[in-house]
Structures are given as structure tokens and as C-alpha cells.
Swiss-Prot record:
SUPFAM superfamilies per UniProt: lambda repressor-like DNA-binding domains (SSF47413)
Protein name: Multiprotein-bridging factor 1
Binding region for DNA: 93-112
Gene from which the chain derives: mbf1
Organism: Schizosaccharomyces pombe (strain 972 / ATCC 24843) (Fission yeast)
InterPro entries, A to Z: Cro/C1-type_HTH (IPR001387), Lambda_DNA-bd_dom_sf (IPR010982), MBF1_N (IPR013729)
């Protein structure tokens, strides 16, 4: 038989049999085995898109933490020490704020005990008022320079 006698069909599959099917579940694989079909199981390894982002993991960890801790504020003892020291010198809050080059609102926040402690502001207040506002003995007078 020559090539002139064969009929060429466009769009049909070469060879007899059903088209190949990808079974996605275990039950589909078992039914194909019962029917006597050729079954080949291969595991797909797609590692190109599995790179993990450490920043995303960190953000997920932060999201899972349900505790939101508010920043610590100055205690009542610091607030009372500032008030007593300022009143002993006869200053208003405005006068103290001018002497330490801060806004009056900052002094008000420290005296009410709701300010977030800033070491620079506290040291300015300590020097202006002459009392300790940090560490132990809050409200005690500041010692002068050490004697040699």
C-alpha cells in the first residue's frame, strides 16, 4: 500500500485507545486499576515557587501574638516628685518648661504620670529642679560633684 491510498485525518489522535487522564484522587487511581488501564504514579516536585519569605513568617508570628503591650509610662512617684520640686522653687509648669527648653504639654504629661519616659527630658528636669527622678531614691536631692 502506498502513501497515496492512506487517508490523513487532521486533529485525530495517533494510535488507538482513550486519551491519557490524570487521576487526582486515590479512588480514581483504584478504579483505573480495576478497569485494567495502564497506571503510572509519579509525584510532582514543583520547587520553583516554594521559596519562603522570612519577613512574611515574622509578620505572621507578630499577628498571632494577641497581646498588645502599651508603652510604659512614668510612675506616680516621679509625677509627685516633679510637682513637689517645682512648687518648692515656686515655678509654674510654664516656667519649668522654659528652663528645660520643652513644651508646657511635656511637663504636664510628666506631672500627670502619662508620659513615656525620655532620659534626656528627665535629666533636664533633674538638673533644673535639683532632685532625682530616675533610679532609686526618687525625690531625693541631687548630690553635687564628687569631692576628690
Amino acid at each position: 500500500m502506498s502513501d497515496w491510498d492512506t487517508v490523513t485525518k487532521i486533529g485525530s489522535r495517533a494510535g488507538p485507545g482513550a486519551r491519557t487522564h490524570v487521576a487526582k484522587t486515590q479512588s480514581q487511581i483504584n478504579s483505573a486499576r480495576r478497569a485494567g488501564a495502564i497506571v503510572g504514579t509519579e509525584k510532582k516536585y514543583a520547587t520553583g515557587n516554594k521559596s519562603q519569605d522570612p519577613a512574611g513568617q515574622h509578620l505572621t508570628k507578630i499577628d498571632r501574638e494577641n497581646e498588645v503591650k502599651p508603652p510604659s509610662t512614668t510612675g506616680r512617684s516621679v509625677a509627685q516628685a516633679i510637682q513637689k520640686g517645682r512648687q518648692a522653687k515656686g515655678w509654674a509648669q510654664k516656667d519649668l518648661s522654659q528652663r528645660i527648653n520643652e513644651k508646657p504639654q511635656v511637663v504636664n504629661d510628666y506631672e500627670s504620670g502619662r508620659a513615656i519616659p525620655n532620659q534626656q527630658v528627665l535629666s533636664k528636669m533633674e538638673r533644673a529642679l535639683g532632685i532625682k527622678l530616675r533610679g532609686q531614691n526618687i525625690g531625693a536631692p541631687l548630690g553635687g560633684p564628687k569631692k576628690k
